[in-house]
Amino acid sequence: MTTPSRTVPGFVNAHTHIYSALAPYGMPPASPPPENFVQILERVWWRLDRALDERSLRASARLYAAESLLYGTTTLIDHQESPAFIEGSLDVLADACQEFGIRAVLCYGATDRNGGREEGRRGLAECRRFIRGNQRPLVRGVVGLHASFTCSDETLHEAGEVARELDTVMHVHMAENRADVEDARKRGYEGPLERLLATDSLPAGSIMAHGVHLEPSQVRVAESRGLWLAQNPRSNEGNRVGYASSLWVSGKVALGTDGWEADMPKEFAALERLSAGSVHEEVDAAARRLVTGRVLAAERFAGAPGAAGPEGDQVIYAAGEDDQPAQVSRVTVAGQVVVDQGRLVHGDLEELRAKAREEAQKLWPRMAAL
């Protein structure tokens, strides 16, 4: 039986890491194999981000932006980390997104984990520089923090000051793993949410990724403060950090991929599967997360000059057989067609993948040497 073509609003990836797009191109396994989440960070992702340079980041950004559009994702809310290439890194991401016609909300995730307070200051300075100078109509900037357990109270407080100075919000990892909670308690706080609130680091409208280890009472506090949460079910399952079972109490929860490909229908399916055993989640929880992501994107682009808002972004699926996955045929962002007949309008996917393979082969030796 044939399914007719259909039109849906563009998808929003509410939390991702564009810099990870080269990982499928032969990233070597961690050695020795990690046994917990912090070891996954230390042996995989923190080594990868330290190995990034301008060329590898550009190849990653161009590929991720292009492939996202082919999945029907029209807005990326990204969290960048590249300690060896901080200054100018957000321009690399922004240029790639503007090139292919995808919306993006960008930040650099400031952290003290490698170079102490000076590293944190440089990350915040990159956010400030980018927000002040960005003129791209499809790109907005916010302030970023990695996760509170990698930051001093001074860096957290300074990040909040920068956000208020620039009249913007924060994008931060929140209670992804128990390590974040335990670190906050060792510092005298009830948890990472309370720590960030105490250091005045979360302006209303801020985006907190994960929230796996928040209690329902904490999620209610977050909602009352006007804070967004971005749930990342595939990543949380893959990293074995648990299911974010308390997020059901908030109406401000969107769906992200945490660096996985921006295939939001696949993320939707993962959330449906993982939430099936929850006594609290409503049957339409996954669908509501997708809708909420569009509300979040509209909030971040409200009043942006030079382009129509994300509310009009559209994806058209081609007609096809019921037993076959739906195929994206056409994608429109800000009134411009960026995918037509299933192909990029502004680039060649195979050329982008070839460049990604080339840069990946240079990246892995740098990563192994760290």
Give the location of each predicted region.
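Divalent metal-coordination and catalytic microenvironments
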Residues: 15, 72, 97, 143, ...
